[in-house]
Amino acid sequence: MFAAKYQFLRTVKVTVYLRFVVSNKPEINFKPSVKQLKAWNFLTDSVTNFVGYGGAAYGGKSYLLCYWLVSMSAAYPATAWGLGRKELSVLRKTTLITLFKVLEECRLIPGKHYVYNAQSNIITFANKSVIFLLDTAYQPSDPLYTRFGGLELTGCAVDESSET
C-alpha cells in the first residue's frame, strides 16, 4: 500500500510542473526513481541554487535534466533555459536525442508546441520560453565564461559537467 501511494505522490509532484495549455493535453509519463525525486525536489525548491547530480551509467541523469528543462519551459512562459555540454556536436548526438524523447513522451508536437532551430541551436516553445543549446568547452579567450552572461538564463543544466 505504501509503495503504491508513494509512487502516486512522486508522479503527482512532477505532474504539477507541466501545465502547458494545448488542445490535446500533454501526457506525463515520468515516474522518477527515489534518487531522481530527491534531485527534482532540490531543482524545484525555492532555496537551492545549484544541484550536482551524479551516479552510474543509465541512472537517468540526462533524462531528469531534460525533463526538468521541458517542464520548467512549459510551466513558466517567456523564460530562457540553457542545456550545455562540452561540445555541441556531442550534445546533439546524445542529450538532444534524450530531450526529443522527453518532448515526445509529453506529447508535445514539433511545429505546434515547440520549434527546434538547428542553425541557432534554440528550441522555442509556444509560450515563448526557449532552451539554448550551449557549447561549454573552456576557451582561453574567455576564461571566465562571460559569453554566457548576456543570455539572461532562468536556469541551466550541464550534462556530463565533469567534461567541462
Model-derived segments and their meaning:
Residues 2-164:
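Phosphate/NTP-binding elements of NTP-utilizing enzymes
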